[in-house]
Amino acid sequence: MVSARYPIEKWSRPQLEDHFHNVVEELNKAQKKVKEQEKQITTFNSRFRRSMLERKSQNEKVVERSKYDDVVKENQILDMKLKAAKQQLLIYTAPSARATTASMMTGRSTFRQPPSTFRQRPPLTAGTTGSIDRPGSAPVARKKSDGGEKLQLATDEKLAIVRLNRTLKNKNDEITELKYTIEKLRQLKSSVNQSSPPTRLSTSSSSKSSSSNNNNDGEGKDSELEEMSEMSDDESGRSTPVIEEKKKPRRKSRKSSHQEPSKNPIPPPRIPDQTEKVLLDKLKVAENDLAMLQEECDLVKKANERLVHQSLSKSTEYGARESIEEKKKIVELEELLKETEKRIKESEHRRREDQKKFEAMRLHYKNKYDAAKKTEKKLSVVAKNSKVEEERIEEEKISHSPPPMTFEPIRKRHSQSEISRMRRADDDLLQKLYKEVADILHSHDVGIAEINTLGASENSLARWQKLYSELYEELEKVRNMLLIQYDINQKQMKEIKLLKDELDRLKTVSAEILSKSREEVEERQKKIFMLEEQIRTIAYSGQQPVKLLANQINIPTPRVNTDLSVKLINVKPSPSLTSKFFFSLEFFDFQLETTPIMDAKQHNMDFTTVYDVLVSNLLIHYLQTNGIVIEMYRPASDCYKLLAAATISLIPLFEDSVLRKFCSEIMLKSVDTGVEMCTLRYEIEVSQPISDSFKKFKKSEMARNMLPLQLENEDTEDTNFDPLTIMVNRVVGLDTFGKDPSTEFCIVDEFLSFSPYFTDFSTSSEIRSKRDCYIPKIDIARNLFATSSISFFLIENIPRQDGVIATLHLPLHPLCKLGGSIKGTFPMLDTDGRPSSVSLDLCLIWKHEIPSFFLKHEPKEPLKEVKDTPILPQPVRRTSKEFVVTPVKEAELHDAEPTSMPPKAPEPTTAPLRRLSTDSSDTSFSHSSKDLFSPPTNPQTYDYEIPAVTPALVDSDGEEEADRIVFDDDDDEIESVSAVSSQRDPEPLEVPERQVENLPSPEDTPRPSDPLKPNGTNESKESTPVTQRSVDKTDDVAPVDPELEPESGPEPEPVVESEPNEVAETEEDRKRELKTEELKSLLGALPPIAKPRNIPVGPIALTEQPEATRQQGSTGRILFTDPLHFSVPPSESSSTSSPRRAEKAPVPLPDYEGHSLIKVRKPLSPTDKDVLEPNMKVSIQLETFELVPGSSLTPLTREETTFFVDWVFLDFTNEQSKSTIFDFPRRPQEMVDIRYTKEYTLTRGQLSLLDQWIRASIKFELTIIKISPGDEEELGFGSLILVPNNTQNKSFVIDVYDRSGIVQAEMTLTLHFSRALIEQLT
C-alpha cells in the first residue's frame, strides 16, 4: 500500500522563502490599505456628522422678531428696486423712448439751456404729426410682454437694436429740420439787413410804424423759434426724464422773463440794431442746439454699433441655456396647441357633416314610412278580396321597406396633419379603433319600428349627441394612448443614449484592458523563452555519450524519484515480554504506518509498506540526521504504551555492492531500562538504485545553478557575468583527407550547458569565428571549469549524415588561473579515437581579467577538504544491535536468520592491516559524507582483509580492487592538455610506485588508540565506509583503522584476523598487477566519439565501463568497499581524456600569432577618471506631463499643487538631477508643458560608467515629487532603458506608476547622445 503525503519535497527552500515573503508583503499591503480606508471612513463619518449637526442646528434655530422684520423690509425694498428696474427696462426698450446709454456711457448730461425768447408749449398729443413718439406702441409691447414674457426675453436684444435704429432715423430727421430752419433764419437775416434804412433820421410815425412792423415780424419769428425750442425740449424730455425736471424751473424763469416786457403797456422803442442782435442770438442758439443734436446722434450711432457687436459676440450667459430650453418648450407647446385646435375644428366639422347627413336620412326614412303607411291603408280594403293581392302587398311592403342601416365610414380627403399622424400610428391600433367605432355605430342603428316610436326632434338630437360624446371619448382614449406611447419612446431614446455612452466607455476600458493584456502576454512570452532556455540547459546537462558497443544494454535515464519498500520478515521477542504488541514505522514526512497486533512469540511477518521517495535537499538532510524509526507499542484498555524503539539507516543503499535490495536485522531496546525487547529482521528494496537518483538530482542541481546564463536578447547586469571569448581561427591539414576542394566544412563547439555553436559552412580553411559566452560569477562555475572540458567537432556537409570527421577535447582547468588562456594549434582525433593529420588553431581567453573568485589560493600545508554540498547522509548515532547487510536476489526472499562469522584471535603481524570500528548504532558508515560530483583531491583505494582459508574471496577482492584506479590529481602543475596526451604510452611501473610514494610513512601512520579518546589523526584524512559484520552477543570486536599501513611497522598492532606474511605479500603484488593492467586497458582502448548532439556536457566517469559480475563470498555476505563518490574521476566532462600524470612533463602550448580580435578597453587611472571630455554630452529634455483617465491623482487637480521631477543618472549629485517646479494639471487628460532641458558633459570615468549602464541595461529612473508646505511627497515613478542609439531625438512616453504598480500618468521626454559619445559607445 502507498501512503498519501503532501509533496513537500517538490518545493525548494528559495521557493518557500519567496512565497513566504510574498505573502507577508501582501499582508502588509492589505493592512496599510485597511488603515487608509478606516481613516477615510472616519473622515467621512465626521463630515457627515458635522453636516447633520449643522443642518439640525439650522432647523432648530429661532430667529428674532426684529431680524425677521428687517429681512422682510429688505425683501420689500428689493422687490421695489426690481420693479423699478423692470420699468426702466421697459422704458428703454420702448420705441418712443430715447436711449439713455449714450449719456450714461459718455458720463455727461444732455441738458441744454433753451433760449429766453422761446415760450412753453403744451406736450404733443397722440394725434400730433411730426412727433417721434408712437404712443400706441407701448400698450402693444406691454400686451405682447404680458402674453409671452418668455418670447420677449429671447428677442429683447433684437428689439433694442431695432429701436435704436428708429431713434437714429428720427434724430436724423430732426437734424434735417433744424438745418432747414437755420437756413431759413439766415435768409431772414439777409432780408432784414437789406430792408433796414441807411439813416435813423425819420419821423415818429415812420419810426412807430417801422417798430410795429419789426415787432410783428419779430413776434412771428419768436413764435417759430419758440416752437422749435419746445420741440427740441420735448425730445430731450422724452429721452431723459431726469434732465427734464431740471429744465422746468429754467423754463419758468425764461417764461417770466419773456412775459415781463409783455406786461408793460408801452414797449421800449426798438432800433434795427437790436433786432439784428436778437436774430443773431437766436441763430447762435439754434446752431448750438444743432451741434448738440449731432453729438447725441453720433453717440446713439456708437451705442447702436456696440449693441450690435455685443449681440453678435455675446456668449450664452445669464441663464441663456435655460431661456433657450424654455423657448423650445414654448414652441413645442404652441405647435401642440395649434394641432389640438386643428383637431377640434376638424372634429367639429365632421360632427356637423354627420349631423346633416343623419338629419337627411331621418327625413328620408320618415317620408318613406308615411308613404308606406298610406299605401297600407289603401290596400287593407282590397286585402280581404284576394289572397294574391295580399301576398303582392306584402311583397311590395317588403320591397318598399328601407334596407337596414349600416355604418359606412365617410371617405374624405384627409389633411396633411392627419396623414402624418396616420403614418406614425400603428396599423393594428387603427384597425382596432375602426372596429370599436363601427361597433358603436351598429349599436345605434335605427329601424322602421324604432323610427315610429321616435317622438319629437329633441330625442333624436339627444341620441346623436350621446353618440358623438361616445366617439369623442374613444378619440380621447386614443389620444392618451398616443401620448403614453410618445413618453415611452422618449424614455427609450434616453435609455438608448445612456447605453450608447456606456458602450463608448466600455470600449475605452476594453481598449485599456487589451493593451494591458498585450503587455502581460509579452512578459509571459519572455518568461516562456527563459523557461525554454532553462529546460534546454537542464537537457544539455544530462546528455550521455552513445557507446559503440553492440552488446551493451541501453539503460534508461534514472529518475529523481524511486519507490522504497520496507518489508518486516521475522520478529523474535525476548522471554521477558508476555503481552501483545505491534510496531509503528515513521519515515521522513510520510504517514505513520502500523502493523497488526501480534502475540509475544517468535513468528514470521508479512508486512510491507512502500514509500515514493523524491530526492531533494530536504531528504538529503533527513538521511544525514535520521532514518526509518521503528517503535514497539503495547495496547492497553484506552491507550498505547511505548516499549522499545530503534532506527534503520538507509546508507547501505548507497554502497556499490548493494544495488536494489538488502536485508538485515535490528535490536529494539526498552526506552526506560535499555533492556533488549525483541530482534526484528527486515528487508529494504528500491525500484532503481537510489545512487542513480542522487546523481540525477545533483546534475539537475548543477544545471539549475548554471541557469543564470546571459541570453542574446536578455538585458542583465554585466556585474553578474564575465564574458569568455572562444575564437576558432583556421583548420590545418584539410588537404590530407583527399576530399574534393568544393566540399564544405564547419566547426561545432560544445561548451558547458550552452547551445552548440555552428560556424558557417565554407570550403576555405580559414574559419575566423568568434563567440562570447557569459559565465555567471558563482561558485559552481569555478567547480565546473576545474572538472569540465570543451569539445570541437569538424563536420562535413553531407546530407542525411552527421558528417563528423575529427574531434578535439580540451580541459578548461587552465582558464581558472591568473592570466589563464588556451591558445595554439591542437591536433584532432578521428572518429575512432586515433590521432589524425588535422589540427585546429583556436584561442580561449577571458574578455576581461579573470574573476577573483576563480582564483584558488594554494594552502601551504595540506588541509582537510571541506565539501560544499554533502550528498551522502551522516551516520545516525542510535542504540541498536549490530547488523550484517546480506545481498538478496531479485526473485528470492530470505527468511532465515543471519549467520555470524567465527571470531578470530588477534595476532601480531607485519602484513597490511585493517580495523573494524565498533559502534552501537545501526549504521556504522563513513563519518564524513562526500559530494557525489566533487571528487577528492587524492582519491585512494582501501583493501579489506579476507580469511586465508577461502581463496574465492581473495579472487573476488582482487576483482573489486581492479575496478579502482589510483592516480594523482595535481591540477596546478598542468596549464593545458591536448587530446594527443591520451595516446601516450603508459608506464605500468610508475603508477604503483607513485602510489607507494604517496602512502604515509611509517612514522605518520596512525596508531590504534583507546576508543574513548578522540582520533586526532583521522581528522586530517578522509574517512572511508566500514562494514559491520554480524557476531554473537558474547563476541568482542576491536576497532581497526581503515587506512593501509606499510609492510613493515615499528610496532605490532592487534588485528581481528591473522594471515601468514607470504600470503599477504603475494596478495599485495597481485593487487598491484591488477591495478596496472586496468590502467593500461583504460588508456589503450578508449571509446569513440559520437555525433555532437550526444556528446555529454555533464560529468562522465572513467569507471562507467561495463563492470564484471562480482562473486559472492561463501558466507553469503557483501563486502563494502569505497563510497560512491570516490569512484568519480577528477574530470567529468570527457570520456576520452586520459588521467593526468604528474611524472610526465606538461605539453607546451605555442603562442598565438596574429592580430587580436578582442577589443579590450584599457583601465583608467584615478587621475584620468576626472578628465572632462567636452564632446561627450548627454541631454535630457522633459516635455509634457498628463494624467490618465481614472487616475488616483485626480483629487490633486482641485488643489493648487506644484511638483518637480527628480532622477538618478550616473554619479551626478542630487542637485544636478532635478527639474524646475511646475504646476499640476487642472483637470484630467490635460497636458502640462514642462519644457525643461538638462545637459551633462561627461568625464572619462562617467563615460565608462555610462557604458556599464548600457551594457547592463540599467534603467534611467524618474520620480514625480509633490511639493507640500514643509515636506515633499513622492507621487509616482517611471523608468527608461538606456540604449546607445538615442541620436534621433525620439520622444519617449513613460508610464508613471504609483507604489501599487498602477499607471497614474504619462510623461514625455527626449534623451539625446552626442555623435562623439555614440561613436565611443559603439
From Swiss-Prot:
Source species, domain of life: Eukaryota
SUPFAM superfamilies documented for this protein: C2 domain (Calcium/lipid-binding domain, CaLB)
GO cellular component terms listed in the entry, alphabetical order: ciliary basal body; ciliary transition zone
Tissue specificity as recorded in UniProt: Expressed at the transition zone at the base of cilia. Expressed in ciliated sensory neurons, including the amphid neurons in the head.
Coiled-coil residues: 15-89, 274-362, 456-538
Acidic residues: bias regions: 224-234, 956-975, 1042-1067
Regions of compositional bias (Polar residues) in chain numbering: 108-119, 1015-1029
Subcellular location field: Cell projection, Cilium
Main location: other
Keyword Transferase annotated: no
General remark: An X-box element in the predicted promoter region was identified consistent with other cilia-related genes.
Family: Belongs to the RPGRIP1 family.
PANTHER family attached to this UniProt entry: PROTEIN FANTOM-RELATED, RETINITIS PIGMENTOSA GTPASE REGULATOR-INTERACTING PROTEIN
Protein name: Protein fantom
Taxonomic source organism: Caenorhabditis elegans
Lineage: Eukaryota, Metazoa, Ecdysozoa, Nematoda, Chromadorea
